[in-house]
Curated annotation (Swiss-Prot):
A biological-process GO annotation: translation
Record gene name: rplN
CDD domains (UniProt xref): Ribosomal_uL14
The organism's place on the tree of life at top rank: Bacteria
Single Gene Ontology MF annotation: large ribosomal subunit rRNA binding
Functional summary from the UniProt entry: Binds to 23S rRNA. Forms part of two intersubunit bridges in the 70S ribosome.
Subunit structure: Part of the 50S ribosomal subunit. Forms a cluster with proteins L3 and L19. In the 70S ribosome, L14 and L19 interact and together make contacts with the 16S rRNA in bridges B5 and B8.
PROSITE patterns on file: RIBOSOMAL_L14
Protein name: Large ribosomal subunit protein uL14
Keyword Nucleus attributed: no
Length: 122
């Protein structure tokens, strides 16, 4: 569950290291984002010579949350951290690599490019 002011790790090689959620997209009073949802983020920490700079505002897809993800078969999956992947206006990832596992719930939300770049899909 990601809300405004939540800090997330960046799970790609776009150059950003930490981002902060400044808006959850999808409805005027939408409060929480889960895996696969699109949020607006501000870049808080970036590496030198990366594709993005500190202070930029971008869109991102949430790929990991510390809050449980319930599956229809009754199983539960949770991660150690909150992480996101930066995307452009065409919903394509900015980076060329994804780090760490991603859940298969991203497939249902049509983020196929992220699924294909990920080293492991849980």
């Amino acid at each position: 569950m990601i809300q405004m002011q939540t800090n997330l790790d960046v799970a790609d090689n776009s150059g950003a290291r930490r981002v902060m959620c400044i808006k959850v997209l999808g409805g005027s009073k939408r409060r929480y984002a889960s895996v696969g949802d699109i949020i607006v983020v501000s870049i808080k920490e970036a590496i030198p010579r990366g594709r993005v700079k500190k202070g930029e505002v971008m869109k991102a897809v949430v790929v990991r949350t510390a809050k449980d993800i319930r599956r229809p078969d009754g199983s539960v999956i949770r991660f150690d951290n909150n992480a996101a992947v930066l995307i452009d206006n065409k919903k394509e990832p900015i980076g060329t690599r994804i780090f760490g596992p991603v859940p298969r719930e991203l497939r249902a939300k049509n983020h196929m490019k992220i699924i294909s770049l990920a080293p492991e899909v849980l």
